């Protein structure tokens, strides 16, 4: 079930960052960021994901304050989590 405060793909910030809740539907190959091959880039291993916010596959993201992103998602700001 999608939480009420989940980022929608029509959200202005989501549009600007090319966010998709399903990384496979995103432009991550064309816009791949350094750190991992494009097919391994998703919100779950991004430094902006906030693991202490949300639950299950929906977590916080410092780029979307007060909203939740899907761990299987991707956006153009993806950056490999340190460690």
Curated annotation (Swiss-Prot):
Q: Which UniProt keywords apply?
A: 4Fe-4S, Electron transport, Iron, Iron-sulfur, Metal-binding, Periplasm, Transport
Location of the protein in the cell: Periplasm
Q: How does it assemble?
A: Homodimer.
UniProt: [4Fe-4S] cluster binding residues: 43, 46, 61, 75
Q: Does the keyword Nucleus apply?
A: no
Kindly give the PROSITE patterns that the UniProt entry links to this protein.
HIPIP (PS51373)
State what protein this is by name.
High-potential iron-sulfur protein
Report the family membership. Belongs to the high-potential iron-sulfur protein (HiPIP) family.
What is the top-level taxon of the source organism? Bacteria
Could you state a single Gene Ontology molecular function term?
Answer: metal ion binding
This entry carries the following GO cellular component terms, namely:
periplasmic space
Q: What does this protein do?
A: Specific class of high-redox-potential 4Fe-4S ferredoxins. Functions in anaerobic electron transport in most purple and in some other photosynthetic bacteria and in at least one genus (Paracoccus) of halophilic, denitrifying bacteria.
Report the source organism. Marichromatium gracile (Chromatium gracile)
Q: Does the keyword Electron transport apply?
A: yes
Q: Which InterPro entries match?
A: High_potential_FeS_prot, HIPIP_sf
| Gene Ontology BP annotations | aerobic electron transport chain
